């Protein structure tokens, strides 16, 4: 599933081609996504794009009278293409732009979303989200407070969007490894120093992934069709049985609640 770095990579890739241009019309080939494509999107005509923002894993396209909310789901990607390039099987939505470009949404599993809203305030998908991990609001004081009485393992707690947004499975595993914290540790057992270190490495890991264009394991592509290259830097995720890059012990791979977890028994306590 595309996580925060992949969505931010998509935002940065599409923004220069959309802002200042006009949506001439939309082409919806298959509106049966996680939620049905909003009727307002079918009717788009000669609408300028004012900004392209991101909140958590949602892309937000600002229009004069409302917003398009895009979620990439499990397998979605957005590409900027020439208008004449024919659509393929899993290309479900196009925004045809006045500059000769097309924003094309591809999603083999159709678990993404294209929604329209007049205002973002109070929208159900955005209303109960925690702070952005790269913001000042996500800091050691905040994490320590939220972990203090939490009797659950730290890894699933990090992946809870009510705590902090966008730290999905890949980056939770990678950040806990970098911080030396076992994924099964109770959140309430973390010391102040461990909270400081964990916040620090989460920010570093996410920023590094954004620099590399995100992580491509299967479906994700950047807006220019290239994969994300952070997969080459993964320390534990997807490396079950391979030697830890620090101590040489085999990386452990387990599953909890249908989520794959990877860690090093030697380096993470």
Curated annotation (Swiss-Prot):
Cofactor note: Binds 1 zinc ion per subunit.
Residues forming the catalytic site: 2 (schiff-base intermediate with dna), 3 (proton donor), 57 (proton donor), 259 (proton donor)
Gene3D superfamilies, sorted: 1.10.8.50, MutM-like, N-terminal
Gene Ontology biological-process entries: base-excision repair
UniProt cross-references to PROSITE patterns, sorted A to Z: FPG_CAT, ZF_FPG_1, ZF_FPG_2
Entry keyword Hydrolase: yes
Zinc finger map (FPG-type): 235-269
Cofactor: Zn(2+)
GO molecular function list: 8-oxo-7,8-dihydroguanine DNA N-glycosylase activity; class I DNA-(apurinic or apyrimidinic site) endonuclease activity; damaged DNA binding; zinc ion binding
InterPro entries: DNA_glyclase/AP_lyase_DNA-bd, DNA_glyclase_Znf_dom_DNA_BS, Formamido-pyr_DNA_Glyclase, FPG_cat, MutM-like_N-ter, Ribosomal_uS13-like_H2TH, Znf_DNA_glyclase/AP_lyase, Znf_FPG/IleRS
EC number: 3.2.2.23, 4.2.99.18
Residues where DNA binds: 90, 109, 150
Catalytic reaction annotation: Hydrolysis of DNA containing ring-opened 7-methylguanine residues, releasing 2,6-diamino-4-hydroxy-5-(N-methyl)formamidopyrimidine; 2'-deoxyribonucleotide-(2'-deoxyribose 5'-phosphate)-2'-deoxyribonucleotide-DNA = a 3'-end 2'-deoxyribonucleotide-(2,3-dehydro-2,3-deoxyribose 5'-phosphate)-DNA + a 5'-end 5'-phospho-2'-deoxyribonucleoside-DNA + H(+)
Highest taxon of the lineage: Bacteria
Signal peptide: none
Keywords linked to the UniProt accession: DNA damage, DNA repair, DNA-binding, Glycosidase, Hydrolase, Lyase, Metal-binding, Multifunctional enzyme, Zinc, Zinc-finger
Family of the protein in this entry: Belongs to the FPG family.
HAMAP family the record matches: Fapy_DNA_glycosyl (MF_00103)
Subunit (UniProt): Monomer.
Functional note: Involved in base excision repair of DNA damaged by oxidation or by mutagenic agents. Acts as a DNA glycosylase that recognizes and removes damaged bases. Has a preference for oxidized purines, such as 7,8-dihydro-8-oxoguanine (8-oxoG). Has AP (apurinic/apyrimidinic) lyase activity and introduces nicks in the DNA strand. Cleaves the DNA backbone by beta-delta elimination to generate a single-strand break at the site of the removed base with both 3'- and 5'-phosphates.
Name of the molecule in the record: Formamidopyrimidine-DNA glycosylase
